[in-house]
Amino acid sequence: MTIKRALISVSDKTNLVPFVKELTELGVEVISTGGTKKLLQENGVDVIGISEVTGFPEIMDGRLKTLHPNIHGGLLAVRGNEEHMAQINEHGIQPIDLVVVNLYPFKETISKEDVTYEEAIENIDIGGPGMLRAASKNHQDVTVIVDPADYSPVLNQIKEEGSVSLQKKRELAAKVFRHTAAYDALIADYLTNVVGEKEPEQFTVTFEKKQSLRYGENPHQEATFYQTALPVKGSIAQAEQLHGKELSYNNIKDADAAVQIVREFTEPAAVAVKHMNPCGVGTGKTIAEAFDRAFEADKTSIFGGIIALNREVDKATAEALHNIFLEIIIAPSFSQEALDVLTAKKNLRLLTLDVSAAVQKEKQLTSVQGGLLIQDLDMHGFDDAEISIPTKREPNEQEWEDLKLAWKVVKHVKSNAIVLAKDNMTVGVGAGQMNRVGSAKIAIEQAGEKAKGSALGSDAYFPMPDTVEEAAKAGVTAIIQPGGSIRDEDSIKKADEYGIAMVFTGIRHFKH
């Protein structure tokens, strides 16, 4: 079907003028509104004003201009339906064959820190979605464009074939409904947050494609990376890649895990992650010292790992990193000398990210077959006001440092989780075992002689005193755990028996 008449009304005017000029050269009549009409006329394009079509002025500060039978009748009339065509002829309605509309910038408006509620409401588009939906419903007869990126493909098809194919119209219609659904979801989310609704009867979210991925967790799985419509400061989706191969699905998950851990620390810290579990964490007076400790924590598992640091990478740290095979290094920045060292490895991925950014109170979404689980992110850190010491002995100064490190790290280890820390570094990590004492044995075995004098962190309480027994045999001198078991007293007695200082936090950190 030849395009004879187009309705154009856009907020994003990117590449609009040359596109419309070419349409008019092909004999297309253009109807337009407001600022779009003004722009086109200023650039020498003949335009029919929307009021000339509706016979009604634009009113209410532009809130009401396209909601009219002369517009929607021209969009919805099925060309092959004799009754439809007779009705629009009877009422003097002319068919519209092409709709080019994009919407008021609601997302950009609410992204502003100083946005008012009134500003947000005024940027909710009404007429635009109405036209887009009407045209998309009737896509067998109407071509609809919501994205400036589609100007050239549509124009080329019109030039080459004289019309737009049904397949292309379907693709464009599907894109429109995705776009309007995302637009409405963002509005719904904004208003839901304004009124403070915690558990709405429908949960609507919108994500935007960031990049295609080669494959998913395994080569036979397809995958894509999407990011939240509103950027989350300090999130892995906001990281900038400076160097190296394209990120993989597993890279992104591991990098996210590393960022979440290193964010727990204010002092210089380095985190090494493999398969979303930390294999080495260290802190120090400098970032080089912190990385040296993270490396010493587990020299084997760090191979092929992901490193996150919370200070600029300097030359000394870069040289230490360069000596190891790593997949990714994430840091707030890299000195030029560090980049000169690290970019010598062409495949090493270097990412910059403000890992110190305050974590926003996002919801954590976990898919299950046929459903979605939603919970608050576990943002609870070490809080002196919540701790209690049930044992006879209290931790000494160094034990306190190691207990805090173990507690910050164990929160991010797959349950059941046990972490041993000593001298400002992890020395053993026991992850993902079906019983707690099993995880403790793994952490102790990994630590070896370093278990002596170490501090043990547990993500949940001890149902029996066997973990304390294993820790004592290995030389652990301090333990931090939530407490709360009906058999806490058994573990306390066992700790007192061996002179172990035990701290209760009152907070559990399961991670499934």
From Swiss-Prot:
SUPFAM superfamilies: Cytidine deaminase-like, Methylglyoxal synthase-like. Pfam families: AICARFT_IMPCHas, MGS. InterPro entries: AICAR_Tfase_dup_dom_sf, Cytidine_deaminase-like, MGS-like_dom, MGS-like_dom_sf, PurH-like. GO terms for cellular component: cytosol. Pathway: Purine metabolism; IMP biosynthesis via de novo pathway; 5-formamido-1-(5-phospho-D-ribosyl)imidazole-4-carboxamide from 5-amino-1-(5-phospho-D-ribosyl)imidazole-4-carboxamide (10-formyl THF route): step 1/1; Purine metabolism; IMP biosynthesis via de novo pathway; IMP from 5-formamido-1-(5-phospho-D-ribosyl)imidazole-4-carboxamide: step 1/1. It comes from the Bacteria. CDD domains: IMPCH. The IMP cyclohydrolase activity resides in the N-terminal region. PANTHER family: BIFUNCTIONAL PURINE BIOSYNTHESIS PROTEIN ATIC, BIFUNCTIONAL PURINE BIOSYNTHESIS PROTEIN PURH. This is Bifunctional purine biosynthesis protein PurH.
